[in-house]
Design a protein with these regions (language model features):
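Interface amphipathic segments
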Residues: 1-317
Length: 317
């Protein structure tokens, strides 16, 4: 029983043939209609098995997990497989797809991921990033996601008065090509607000990691037209971030950034973070400025003291 429901037609079977364990679980009732099959090979020292789950109806509202019903009950197909040199998962629900694959078994993947984190944390402690070393420590894996308007994510967001045209994401890691990926959402509507395109990209080479994100509203947007971007770059010994805003008339409203460089030499040569404001002629609230005599820095000492030398003049007086 679950609440007022009498759950019937639930069946579990299993078998052992040699070293292969198999199991099958089925459910056919008002709350859950599904079939799950799994197998696992006990003969190997590494995880070796797979599972598939086909859910044709799962009512989250009736289960008390959602305050109001969605457009359709939850239905999805999920499969996962772990072999000696491969890990793969696949989820499909309506027009939503999620895939994760790696060119290694479960245990090597965990070891590689842990090693990458250790290398990254050591470099952060040393305040100097070696992107070539970071790339060598990366596991080879790909994560991808895509969704339209007919899937549980869209149905749930609709209950919150949020909608979108489509969403997609693909990120990959490998020693050969580093960390690369992109993500985008088109025609995102929240109540009366509409954002035409939201995007994010990342690309790593042997010397740096470049990041770019932004929001773009095209000429047909019912509210306002603009392009706003964040551009960043993480290099070996410094990082930079710039924000740029251009309105529908092509006029720059904001162009402003900061460069951050750790100073670690000590003995009067620095022990903190030096921030340099960029570019040489920033734009703030549609007004162009310039820094007088290179007065564009802020120094954050590790002893919590702050030193600054900023002098900006506007070209408009």
């Amino acid at each position: 029983h679950y609440a007022q429901y009498h759950l019937s037609n639930v069946d579990l079977t299993g078998a052992l043939k040699g070293a292969l364990v198999t199991a099958r679980l089925t459910s056919d009732n008002v709350l859950l209609k599904m079939t799950t099959e799994a197998e696992y090979n006990l003969a190997h020292s590494y995880p070796d098995g797979k599972v598939t789950m086909d859910v044709t109806q799962l009512d989250l509202h009736e289960l008390g997990l959602m305050p109001q019903p969605m457009k359709h009950p939850l239905a999805f197909n999920f499969s996962a497989e772990a072999r000696q040199n491969r890990v793969f998962t696949h989820l499909v629900s309506g027009d939503m797809k999620l895939n994760l694959s790696a060119r290694s078994g479960v245990e090597p993947l965990i070891r590689q991921s842990t090693h990458f984190v250790d290398v990254l944390m050591r470099q952060i402690d040393e305040k100097a990033l070696d992107h070539a070393e970071l790339r060598e420590a990366l596991p080879t894996a790909i994560l991808s996601f895509s969704a339209g308007k007919e899937n549980p994510l869209a149905y749930f967001l609709a209950t919150q008065n949020i909608s979108y045209q489509d969403a997609s994401m693909k990120f990959g890691t490998a020693p050969d090509w580093g960390i690369n990926g992109k993500a985008a959402i088109h025609t995102l509507k929240v109540d009366t607000l509409q954002l035409d395109t939201i995007f994010f990209t990342v690309k790593q080479d042997t010397t740096s990691m470049k990041l770019r994100a932004g929001v773009i509203n095209g000429p047909k947007n019912p509210q306002f037209v603009f392009r706003s971007t964040l551009t960043g770059e993480i290099r070996s010994e410094d990082a930079e971030l710039t924000v740029n805003y251009v309105d529908g008339k092509g006029q720059t409203g904001v162009l402003f950034g900061v460069n951050a460089r750790p100073l670690t030499e000590g003995h009067g040569k620095g022990n903190g973070v030096l921030l340099n404001l960029t570019p040489a002629e920033p734009v703030i609230a549609y007004r162009k400025f310039h820094f007088v005599d290179n007065s564009n820095w802020i120094y954050l000492h590790n002893n919590m003291r702050v030193y600054a030398n900023i002098d900006m003049d506007s070209d408009n007086g």
